[in-house]
Amino acid sequence: MAYVPAPGYQPTYNPTLPYYQPIPGGLNVGMSVYIQGVASEHMKRFFVNFVVGQDPGSDVAFHFNPRFDGWDKVVFNTLQGGKWGSEERKRSMPFKKGAAFELVFIVLAEHYKVVVNGNPFYEYGHRLPLQMVTHLQVDGDLQLQSINFIGGQPLRPQGPPMMPPYPGPGHCHQQLNSLPTMEGPPTFNPPVPYFGRLQGGLTARRTIIIKGYVPPTGKSFAINFKVGSSGDIALHINPRMGNGTVVRNSLLNGSWGSEEKKITHNPFGPGQFFDLSIRCGLDRFKVYANGQHLFDFAHRLSAFQRVDTLEIQGDVTLSYVQI
């Protein structure tokens, strides 16, 4: 079952190293680049480059380079005309060998803001115009789980969604009316419990994106699609880390229905990051985790358009939610 990203959300899952790919739509103010991965047990260094062009020796607008060398530090620099500029350094290491991490670059008008595992880490002022950046390069002692470009495609509030310029591997462009859509603005690092209002209700083809982290001691958390006026829950997703299950159910007229538990894989391990895409179809929800189909859940609330609230609570840290 092919995963087709919603416009404005361009993920690549399990990319191989070295990674060197164009940035969909180019770099723009307000764009975020999410990199989820695992640092090697024997990590010495890795780097992320925001590159001007695809040719060898191209300028590097921003070079981000963690180094485990006895003086654990992160180095920041710019390569222009074949020459490195003056280094900026931070003698602090936010990455742990063998541990999962989430690295976010937020592109702002004056600088790149770097966030690691939800914590602001550094701000690097632009030395080259950000509009010149065309490619992202990643390599070194790490394993990549996902790279997501978020906010690079302008979304139109009315009319059909825009065509994503770079379909993922094995994906072809879909008809406009079959593409998933995202309606609301993204929320970064929201607190838990989280309550989000689905403006206009839950419509067919609407996609909800949830990126988060399961703490090592986490026991369970829940994602609920609710009808605010009645308290009905059209879809209850409940990962339970203790027994490795992902329970789905509905609460209608005050009564829980029958649980569904079958999954092909479980992305909600303790100490793991996850990337969840929940799509509302005409007859079911389709749920993908880290780019792989996780489960379908047939609508039990036939008037699913009445769902107007997204609720997330429990043992989870959220890094990004878009409804």
UniProtKB/Swiss-Prot annotation:
This is Galectin-4. PANTHER family: GALECTIN, GALECTIN-4. GO terms for molecular function: carbohydrate binding; galactoside binding. Contains two homologous but distinct carbohydrate-binding domains. One of its GO terms (biological process) is antibacterial peptide biosynthetic process. The gene is LGALS4. It comes from Homo sapiens. Monomer. One of its GO terms (cellular component) is collagen-containing extracellular matrix. Galectin that binds lactose and a related range of sugars. May be involved in the assembly of adherens junctions.
